[in-house]
Structures are given as structure tokens and as C-alpha cells.
Swiss-Prot record:
Gene: obg
Stretches with biased composition (Basic and acidic residues): 466-502
Keywords: Cytoplasm, GTP-binding, Hydrolase, Magnesium, Metal-binding, Nucleotide-binding
Compartment annotation: Cytoplasm
Organism: Arthrobacter sp. (strain FB24)
Protein name per its UniProtKB record: GTPase Obg
Record GO cellular component, one term: cytoplasm
């Protein structure tokens, strides 16, 4: 079973946003509480984060599908749904995030560096958030949107200052074990090293990292052997050290021919453009500082071979060191030479001012609508396809089982200018309109949207209980009516009081009282006769 994986294909999906809630507030003595549906929670994001404790991508090799949690639905009483939890995926330092076609998305260097691999979908609005002066009690809510889904490629490129390159069994693993505390696998057969090994070297006051990669053979840049698979690990290195085998027993090999083959493979290898310097240029591997280490000089023929090829190498401009990983001969001088190159590279980076990118201002055009309409033809019939972030997002948020929600979508599209643009494109009632790409929503277009919410008994976005709310008297009107009633009562009392003072009430009462005894005695007045 593999214990080291430096390239995986990861399938990530953000969480889906929660749906908004449709609810009406219910409380004692408040018959018209209004909408109180809460918003849905946002879906969780999938984030890649550099973790110094992670050294391989093995976990994602066994479990390549990762999904963040979904957002919770909204609830009544203005309660919003729970946001989905963010899924943090730890990756080693030096991980490069790419698309399947090779486009670099991020280069994760530095502890804690993060990259959002898949964003979660936003939650839908509840009917409380959708209410307005014209739409006081919406009977619908918006749906949550699915999170982003993508397939990304993770490639691990080791962070090292110096890279050891050479043929298999040249002694690279023995050299890194002798110069650092690393303990790679060492054996007397080719391709013992199957994974990159890192070691930390201290030379004076300079501390740097060296990388041992699997051996290179002729044709490694074309994929032969293991070199092409692991050459990416030397792309970040500031310098290279050619480890040449002076004790080889193969008749067709010698240090000079090995160096020529390795240099040719390095020249053919195309360095990733994401490792461009501060000036925007990529330094090829064969143009970087290089040292030559003639290894195995402790063998009987190794010393003679090193002395034989050294003048030729020095004449080519190489700094040559005769070393032995077994007896540690020449390792101190080689270590200080590496430290000198590393220090110079670090000083050059520190002295170079950071490149400041001027902000690019792209003001929105005055006539920019945020969408476009493309006219197509299907089955000899015209088809109009509406494309744009807003229309596509609005369609995903619409509950097409709710006529009021469809009417709300029609209002938004009309306000955006889609209907006017369809008229300009020559659309006629009954033509097919598709919002989105191949998987878009298909409509039979009607300019007045008679197939939608206009057929409702009440206006779009209203509650029938609020239909007569505009006819109810206001508090001021009620006060005026009460004052009018008080004035009318006062006027009636004043009129009665005036009649009483005028004696009208006294004469009529005295007359009725005088007539009552005569009726009781059986006598009548002259008028009655």
C-alpha cells in the first residue's frame, strides 16, 4: 500500500443553502402579526489549509470525495437556519491546486495559507425578508442554492533550497543521510528511492533544506523511469547539486556522460509558470546555480576517476567537490558551498522590492444589464436563451410550485429588463425562452405573464386578510369622529336646556298634569265634547 502520495484528484462540493421559511406571526391580541419566516442558513465551504503536520496527500487518495454540510432551513418567529460547518482539509506546504486541464488555481505556501476549493450556496430568504410596502405578507420564500462542485488536482511540490539530482544509485540518499538527520531507505539496487526525501542542513549560521528525488535516467523528461513524476519537486529549489557516481561498474557510463544526460533532461523539462520570479520570468532548471559532487571517492577507482574528470568539469564553469557519503570526506566544504548559494538567493529575494500591482478599475458600463439574450433555433422554431448570473440564480431560488413565487420571479426579470430585451430580439408570445445553459428552465413566453400570478384572486405578494387594510380609519380619523360625536351630544344638550328655560317643557308638563284628574273623574272639557 502506498504511504506517500503527491498527486490526487479531489472532488469537492460546498454545502447547499437552506430554504427560507413561509410563516405568519401568531400572538394573542395581534390578529395581523405579519410574516415572520426566517432565512435559510448558508452552506458550508470547503477550504484547503496548509498544515505543517501534514506531509502527504494519502488521505485524499483513499477518500477523494469531500462534501461540506448543508445550511439549515429557516423557521418561524424570525429564526434563521443554521449555517453549514466549514470543511477544513489540511494539505502539506507546497501543494499546488490545479484544474483538470492544468490551469493553476493556487500555490499554497506558508503555514495557515487557505484556498476556498468550493464555496457553499447561499440560503434562501424567508417571507419576512421579502415583505415590503407593496408585498406585506408574501406567501412564498426563496429556495437555497446548491454549493459549488468541482474536480481539482492537488500536486505536492516539496519546499527545498537545494535539490540533489543524479542517476539511480549515485549516492543521493546516502548523501542526504550523511549531511542531515534524515534517514531515507538506502540499498545497493537502482530506484531504491521512490519518494522525495527532505533533510535540514546547518552550515555555519545558515540553515537550509535539501531534497533527494528519485534517480533520473535518459528520457526522464518524457516520462521514462520515475524522474518525470518527481521532477516537480525540484521546481522550487534555488540551486541543484549533480551527484555523479565515480565508482560505477557499467562500461557505458562515466561522470561526464551522466552529467550530459541529466543536463539534457533538465533542459527539456518545462517548469510550471506559477513559479515565476519577481520579474515575471521562469528560470529553467538548467540555468539555475549548479554544483557538482563527485561521489564515492573512497572506492579504489573512484579517486582516480574524480581526478580524471575534474579538470574537464571545472573548465565548463562548475564548482566541483570530491566527496564520500560513507567516509564524510568533503561534505563540510560542500555544505558551506550550498549555504553560500542559498544565502545569496535569499538576499536577492529580500533586496527585490515586492511588485505592486496597480489596481485595475473596471467601472460598470451605463448600459450594462447583467444579462444577455442569445437567439437560437430548435426544431425550426426560434428559441431565446437568457444568460447571466442574476437570472440563473433567481431561477434556482424560485419555487415553481408556488404561483406567487413565479409572479415574484416575473417581477424581478421585468425590472431587470429581460422582457424589454426579448421584445427587441423579436420574441413573440408563445416563443420558447430558456434561462440558463443546457440544463436551464424552459418557459413559453407571455409578455404579460398571464400564465403566472396574475390569475390569483388577490394581487401578487399580498395576503387577503390585508386587502381592506387601506379602508380602516386612522387614529387621527378616529379622534375626529369621537370629537364630532361629543360636539353633537353637547349641541343636543344645549338645545334641550334652551327649550327648558323657554318654558316649553313646563307648559306641556303642567297641561298633561291638569288633564289627568278630569279623566279620572269622568268629566270632559269643551274641546273634547
Amino acid at each position: 500500500m502506498a504511504s506517500f502520495v503527491d498527486r490526487v484528484v479531489l472532488h469537492v462540493s460546498g454545502g447547499t443553502g437552506g430554504h427560507g421559511c413561509v410563516s405568519v406571526h401568531r400572538e394573542k391580541f395581534k390578529p395581523l402579526g405579519g410574516p415572520d419566516g426566517g432565512n435559510g442558513g448558508d452552506g458550508g465551504d470547503v477550504i484547503l489549509r496548509v498544515d505543517p503536520q501534514t506531509t502527504t496527500l494519502l488521505d485524499y487518495h483513499h477518500a477523494p470525495h469531500r462534501h461540506a454540510t448543508n445550511g439549515g432551513p429557516g423557521m418561524g418567529d424570525w429564526r434563521g437556519g443554521k449555517n453549514g460547518e466549514t470543511l477544513i482539509l489540511p494539505v502539506p506546504e507546497g501543494t499546488v491546486v490545479k484544474t483538470k486541464d492544468g490551469r493553476v488555481l493556487a500555490d499554497l505556501v506558508g503555514e495557515g495559507t487557505e484556498f476556498i476549493a468550493a464555496a457553499g450556496g447561499p440560503g434562501g430568504l424567508g417571507n419576512a425578508a421579502l415583505s415590503s410596502q407593496k408585498r406585506r405578507a408574501p406567501g412564498f420564500a426563496l429556495l437555497g442554492i446548491e454549493g459549488e462542485s468541482s474536480d481539482i488536482v492537488l500536486e505536492l511540490k516539496s519546499i527545498a533550497d537545494i535539490a540533489l539530482v543524479g542517476f539511480p544509485s549515485a549516492g543521493k540518499s546516502s548523501l542526504i543521510a550523511a549531511m542531515s538527520a534524515a534517514r531515507p531507505k538506502i540499498a545497493d539496487y537502482p530506484f531504491t528511492t521512490l519518494i522525495p526525501n527532505l533533510g535540514v542542513v546547518q552550515a555555519g549560521d545558515v540553515r537550509f533544506t535539501i531534497a533527494d528525488v528519485p534517480g533520473l535516467i535518459e528520457g526522464a523528461s518524457e516520462g521514462k523511469g520515475l524522474g518525470h513524476h518527481f521532477l516537480r519537486h525540484v521546481e522550487r529549489c534555488a540551486a541543484l547539486v549533480h551527484v555523479l557516481d565515480c565508482g560505477t561498474l557499467e562500461a557505458d557510463r562515466d561522470p561526464l556522460s551522466d552529467l550530459a544526460i541529466i543536463e539534457a533532461e533538465l533542459e527539456k523539462y518545462a517548469v510550471d509558470m506559477s513559479y515565476a520570479g519577481t520579474d515575471g520570468e521562469v528560470v529553467p532548471l538548467n540555468h539555475r546555480p549548479r554544483l557538482v559532487a563527485l561521489n564515492k571517492v573512497d572506492l579504489p577507482d573512484g579517486k582516480d576517476m574524480a581526478e580524471f574528470v575534474r579538470p574537464e568539469l571545472e573548465s565548463r564553469g562548475y564548482r566541483v567537490f570530491e566527496i564520500s557519503a560513507t567516509s564524510h570526506e568533503g561534505l563540510r566544504q560542500l555544505g558551506f558551498a550550498m549555504a553560500e548559494i542559498v544565502k545569496a538567493a535569499r538576499d536577492a529575494v529580500a533586496a527585490t522590492p515586492p511588485k505592486v500591482h496597480a489596481p485595475v478599475l473596471r467601472p460598470r458600463a451605463v448600459n450594462e444589464a447583467g444579462f444577455k439574450i442569445r437567439r437560437e433555433e430548435k426544431n425550426l422554431e426560434p428559441l431565446f436563451r437568457v444568460l447571466g448570473d442574476k437570472p440563473v440564480r433567481w431561477v434556482k431560488q424560485t419555487d415553481f410550485t408556488n404561483e406567487e413565487a413565479i409572479g415574484y420571479l416575473a417581477d424581478r426579470l421585468a425590472k431587470l429588463g429581460v422582457e424589454n430585451e426579448l421584445f427587441k430580439q423579436g420574441a413573440k408570445p408563445g416563443d420558447t425562452v430558456v434561462i440558463g445553459e443546457d440544463d436551464g428552465v424552459v418557459f413559453d413566453w407571455e409578455p404579460t405573464m398571464m400564465a403566472g400570478a396574475e390569475l390569483l384572486a388577490s394581487p401578487r405578494g399580498t395576503d387577503v386578510r390585508f386587502a381592506d387594510i387601506g379602508d380602516r380609519p386612522t387614529r387621527g380619523q378616529k379622534r375626529d369622529e369621537q370629537q364630532e360625536r361629543r360636539d353633537a351630544k353637547a349641541a343636543a344638550r344645549a338645545e334641550l336646556e334652551a327649550e327648558r328655560k323657554a318654558g316649553i317643557w313646563t307648559e306641556s308638563v303642567s297641561g298633561r298634569r291638569a288633564a289627568r284628574p278630569l279623566q279620572e273623574s269622568g268629566l270632559t272639557t269643551e274641546n273634547e265634547e
